[in-house]
């Protein structure tokens, strides 16, 4: 639970609380989707720093969560952001100074890549906290099991709070956290 909280906390703080201090959805509109796809591949090849867990804790044959790196994907994101900006109601992108000159320090393709990952992490962060739900915790301040207050575990009973199916969900969340840190967070942090 603590590890998934740490990864989720870093993702939320980077993408949702700090990224828009450095990247702009308005600047992303000037990006070329083909150049952005090439940039995404370059960033992954250059900045991927594999976070490795002990071998016994790796339970998936391969990583499942990679950033999309196709021109079609980035064109879809660009069109989505364009519709939001042109509507004049920026919603999640409101209350910023998009005309500030420092937003021009990064190329538009970095802005588009980062905004795409910002949007992806809105969904991914929800999945990362499922271990908190399964073990009866909450976020961002999980309840840890106090002595004398056991959590019912049964690998056979489908109604037990912790069972085989729920443990596989926890395992998936842990592996997802590792993939997101390796393939999104660390490369984006170094690129931006």
Q: Where are the regions a protein language model picked out?
A:
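Active-site bordering "gate/hinge" segments
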Residues: 1-192
């Amino acid at each position: 639970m603590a590890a998934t909280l740490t990864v989720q906390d870093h993702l939320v703080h980077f993408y949702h609380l700090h990224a828009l201090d450095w990247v702009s959805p308005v600047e992303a509109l000037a990006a070329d989707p083909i150049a952005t796809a090439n940039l995404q591949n370059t960033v992954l090849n250059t900045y991927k720093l594999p976070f490795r867990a002990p071998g016994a804790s790796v339970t998936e044959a391969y990583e499942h969560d990679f950033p999309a790196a196709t021109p079609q994907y980035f064109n879809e994101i660009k069109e989505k952001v364009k519709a939001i900006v042109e509507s004049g109601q920026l919603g999640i992108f409101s209350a910023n100074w998009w005309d500030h000159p420092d937003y021009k320090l990064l190329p538009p393709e970095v802005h588009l890549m980062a905004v795409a990952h910002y949007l992806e992490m809105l969904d991914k962060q929800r999945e990362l906290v499922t271990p908190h739900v399964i073990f009866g915790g909450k976020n961002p301040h999980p309840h840890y099991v106090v002595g004398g207050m056991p959590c019912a575990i049964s690998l056979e009973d489908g109604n037990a709070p912790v069972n085989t199916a729920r443990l596989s969900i926890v395992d998936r969340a842990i592996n997802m956290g590792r993939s997101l840190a390796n393939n999104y967070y660390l490369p984006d942090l170094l690129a931006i």
